Amino acid sequence: MSNYREQQGAIRPLVCNVCSFTQPVGDIPSLLTIDEVETLFHEFGHALHGLLTKCNYKGISGTNVARDFVELPSQINEHWATEPEVLKMYAKHYQTGETIPDSLIEKILNQKTFNQGFMTTELLAAAILDMNLHNLTNTQNLDVLAYEKEAMDKLGLIPEIAPRYRTTYFNHIIGGYAAGYYSYLWANVLDNDAFEAFKEHGIFDKKTADLFRNNVLEKGNSEDPMTLYKNFRGTEPQLEPMLKNRGMK
């Protein structure tokens, strides 16, 4: 499709989320796991990024943004999936219609902090390894496993915790995330800090939602990501909300 179009009239974006979820079994309908529900919210966040764009050029609209900014709209949307107030709107027993009990909501929230210290260290190790590999200037006769061990030893990584992906099967570093694997954790910093604004003013607060829409979702890649974020939040992103939500603070 051409990136050029006639200048008269509005062109409405068309976005479709296609998901592969748990199939129905016999007379039992498709019942989504909590992970699948979060995936649905996540992908709809990407959809909103495309639907609400006000950019004039396709190449900088919607999700056509920096790699370390693209997951903010999707990951912040995941937060609503497990907010108790939202859960009670849709989490119903498929036979009785009974609303999910508070005891089960508590378990869903508690599992979010399980093993997060281990997981965060894995991700950080892989991100640093990715950066180190892309800082190499001479790769002749490089023993990648020996290099990985040396890099991890310098970090003080204990043998029980390895990088999330070992060098020999680290597909991200040659599949679009070269020197960019850190963006997964950075996006988590952004989405947790951004959602903190909603928690401060109410998770359905229209003013906060409009700020996010006007300064992030509509803007695409038309301005520097940090400028857009600060226009929304009023400050640079803080690390504390991510650490708190991972049970590490």
Where does each model-flagged region fall?
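Cation-handling catalytic/transport regions enriched in His/Asp/Glu
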Residues: M1-K249
